[in-house]
Regions:
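Secretory targeting and sorting signals
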Residues: 4, 25-58
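Beta-propeller fold detector
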Residues: 93-103, 152-158, 196-207, 253-261, ...
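C-terminal region of N-terminal signal peptides and the immediate post-cleavage residues
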Residues: 48-68, 75-76, 250-252
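Blade-level signature of beta-propeller repeat domains, shared across WD40, Kelch, NHL, RCC1
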Residues: 381-390, 394-420
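Short loop/turn segments immediately following beta-strands, especially the blade-tip
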Residues: 85-92, 144-149, 189-196, 244-252, ...
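Beta-rich, blade/repeat-based domains predominating
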Residues: 61, 65, 102-124, 159-173, ...
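Short loop/turn segments immediately following the C-termini of beta-strands
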Residues: 75-77, 87, 136, 179-181, ...
Length: 420
């Protein structure tokens, strides 16, 4: 008895547990993402958001779209939430409300600090003015319309698979990466009424995970190349970087991805340089970054061999101008990198640390960069905090703020952050 993946309807009942774009600015597109399986691919909830906010007069946001905002995904198992913050011109954060997503958070098996074990679980899309969040524990994706720092018009749809953990956006198209089971990517159209399933877009990743995957065998991220011609997925357990060449209509041009062996061990996060022509992949095994060219046919060319930062367990990577910042969860540090005009990547200093580590900033995970590339925000899962840093002219980071009382890593923990 078959299942139509794109309509979401099945002739047999599901036996799963389910009940129901970038953390930072990306070059050559207007999408920001925040880091982290399913039933019918149709809207399953559209309700008034439960929210605690200050009066509207206290917000500096514009009438449409996000403005001076940072969003943090709580990823709570009993009900996922988005914590909104107003961002001052000096980078300091003030709480601006907590919003229920209408889905549940998730926790991958044996995850050490990062419950979703991914990058890109929370995405703000400038073009549509929408914030997109995964609900890993209920196999759904939530969209909100953003006004300033406020979230409105919640819509919830099935992710099309098990344990959604990453979202990519290009133009009017979004793809969700499902980490559980065989793993998959599922496409959606971004509309004024939320996400609509894109017929014919579902593609399997051919993995062999449980519905709730192990953190070290789950895929790490899905992302579009800035020109939209390729959709890229990292797989930690298979040690591959897999690419789907895309058609202009937003559908994959191939039934199966082009599989490239990773130059470094355990590929995790994806980022691109300011030109959009070079792809950087963070690799957790030896805390390295490899620079690639993504060819139109999906094959990768190594432009620079893995560069080690001397830290422990690099998993997340974001760009601010010609600088890149990586989160090392093994020893709770942030590394800085700089790319010269020839595309050569190097560390910003000899020790590989962009800012001094802090006892109150433990369990470094996901990062976000503001659209003006002046500030970097870092999640500390063990401490339950977010640190904000000013980007200095030499690439060093100066701490300007700390947001506290966020969900601390335990049975699960926060993961996913976006900055505007």
């Amino acid at each position: 008895m078959g299942t139509d993946r794109d309509s979401g309807y099945s002739e047999h009942g599901r036996t799963s547990r389910h009940s129901g774009t970038r953390r930072g600015h990306r070059a050559k597109r207007r999408t920001r993402r925040i880091v982290l399986g399913g039933g019918a691919l149709a809207t399953v909830a559209a309700a008034t958001v439960a929210v605690t906010v200050a009066s509207a007069g206290q917000y500096s946001g514009s009438a449409a779209g996000a403005d001076h905002a940072v969003f943090v995904q709580g990823n709570e198992l009993d009900g996922n939430t988005i914590h909104a913050f107003a961002r001052g011109d000096d980078g300091k954060l003030k709480p601006a409300g907590t919003y229920e997503t209408g889905g549940k958070g998730g926790d991958q098996i044996d995850a050490p600090t990062d419950s979703l074990a991914s990058q890109g679980s929370l995405v703000y899309d400038d073009r549509s003015g929408m914030l997109l969040a995964v609900n890993a524990g209920s196999g759904t994706v939530t969209s909100f319309r953003v006004e300033g720092q406020r979230l409105k018009d919640r819509k919830v749809v099935s992710s099309g698979g098990e344990f959604p953990s990453s979202i990519a956006v290009h133009g009017k198209t979004a793809y969700v990466m499902n980490a559980g089971g065989e793993g998959s990517v599922q496409g959606f159209r971004i509309t004024g009424k939320g996400l609509k399933p894109l017929k014919g877009s579902y593609r399997s990743l051919g993995l062999d995970n449980e519905d709730i995957p192990r953190f070290d065998t789950s895929p790490g991220e899905v992302d579009f190349t800035p020109d939209g011609r390729n959709l890229v997925v990292t797989t930690k357990g298979n040690n591959t970087v897999e690419v789907f060449p895309m058609k202009r209509n937003g559908l994959p041009a191939v039934a199966e991805p082009v599989v490239n062996e990773s130059a470094g061990g355990v590929p995790f996060a994806i980022s691109f340089d300011a030109t959009g022509k070079r792809m950087l992949v963070a690799e957790a095994e030896k805390s390295t970054v490899t620079t690639y060219k993504v060819n139109r046919d999906g094959k990768l060319k190594v432009l620079q061999q893995p560069l080690a930062n001397g830290q422990e367990t690099l998993c997340w990577l974001e760009r601010a101008g010609n600088y890149f910042y990586g989160g090392n969860t093994g020893n709770s540090t942030v590394s800085g990198y700089v790319m010269d005009k020839h595309g050569k990547l190097s560390l910003t200093n000899d020790v590989g640390i962009a800012t001094p580590p802090s006892a109150n900033s433990q369990g470094v995970i996901d990062l976000a960069v503001t659209e003006d590339e002046k500030f970097v925000y870092v999640q500390n899962a063990v401490s339950g905090t977010v640190d904000g840093f000013r980007v200095e002219s030499d690439g060093a980071l100066t701490k300007v703020t700390t947001a506290e009382d966020l969900p601390v890593f335990g049975e699960s923990g926060m993961e996913g952050i976006a900055a505007v």
